Curated annotation (Swiss-Prot):
Belongs to the low molecular weight phosphotyrosine protein phosphatase family. Pfam families: LMWPc. CDD domains: LMWP_ArsC (cd16345). The gene is arsC. Reduces arsenate [As(V)] to arsenite [As(III)] using glutathione and glutaredoxin as sources of reducing equivalents. GrxA is the most effective electron donor in vivo compared to other glutaredoxins. Constitutes the major arsenate reductase compared to ArsI1 and ArsI2. Also shows weak phosphatase activity toward p-nitrophenyl phosphate. The active site is at C8 (nucleophile), C80 (nucleophile). This is Glutaredoxin arsenate reductase. Changing C8S: Abolishes arsenate reductase activity. Homodimer.
């Protein structure tokens, strides 16, 4: 079973939604974690957006990348274009992708929904590719 790490700047919105989708859609196929270059909180609007599609991410936590070891993961996905800021060991794993999705923080609910849809589609494609 492949181990996947989703990373974004604050581990608040995009990476949290990706973790929620991956845990739900990839249950039994992949192991999933998320982190940020810095930690903050799981954004309340991200929680609400995922509730709209029947996924509860309210129990997820926002954790800094320093809490994890890159060698524990086969797949590393940056969601925010922050790949250039990751320590080198994170971008040299078996699979590294930088999805460069828009940050919905502070934007309309429609932007959140659009980003949520983009995250879901990419997570589905990732699961199909690695499982």
């Amino acid at each position: 079973m492949k181990k996947v790490m989703f990373v974004c700047k604050r581990n608040s919105c995009r990476s949290q939604m990706a973790e929620g989708f991956a845990k739900t859609l990839g249950a039994g196929k992949i192991a999933v974690t998320s982190c940020g270059l810095e930690s903050s909180r799981v954004h309340p609007t991200a929680i609400a957006m995922m509730e709209e599609v029947g996924i509860d991410i309210s129990g997820q936590t926002s954790d800094p990348i320093e809490n994890f070891n890159a060698d524990d993961y086969d797949v590393v996905i940056s969601l925010c274009g922050c790949g250039v800021n990751l320590p080198p060991e994170w971008v040299t794993q078996e699979i590294f992708e930088d999805w460069q999705l828009e940050d919905p923080d502070g934007q309309s609910l429609e932007v959140f929904r659009t980003v949520r849809g983009q995250v879901k589609e990419r997570v589905e494609n990732l699961i199909a590719k690695i499982s």
